């Protein structure tokens, strides 16, 4: 579902986002009443805005390198800026990847003084954006940190070998999240680990497709 456009970039909302939001608000309404449900809705809107600005950071930085963005889609657990093409230089990928967490860091810095002045919700907003920025810097695909890792490795190994090594490292993080999730019975960690494994497999298939017809095989 397309909501609006920013600088010619369509902003879309996946249907699962609305379903999950409705579930969370309904649960809070039944469990804790109208006030708690309203606060949950406000938090969800703040998270929505933060993720959108994060993805716009990627998209507008990519535009500086001549790379257009087809759309930005927001999902329950994050967003995706669909670039028209991959960056051709490691430096481009590095700056595009870092732009998203940098936006979250800037939002946290803006909100922090407001929190110190006692503005309601500012502290939570700052903490949320700080957590988003740090979480996205985890060096595992498809997180921004995974792309930063590949950009750094590409300077020494080339993009093909760098992608293989970055995906191998990403698998360790994915299995780590799953192991900790099982040990602590944390559904969130299990979902993150499963999502990372899915994304790693998709990137592996994408690279294998690009290598089709060459003498090199892509396997991890």
Language-model segment annotations:
Residues 1-220:
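Hydrophobic transmembrane alpha-helices and their immediate loop junctions
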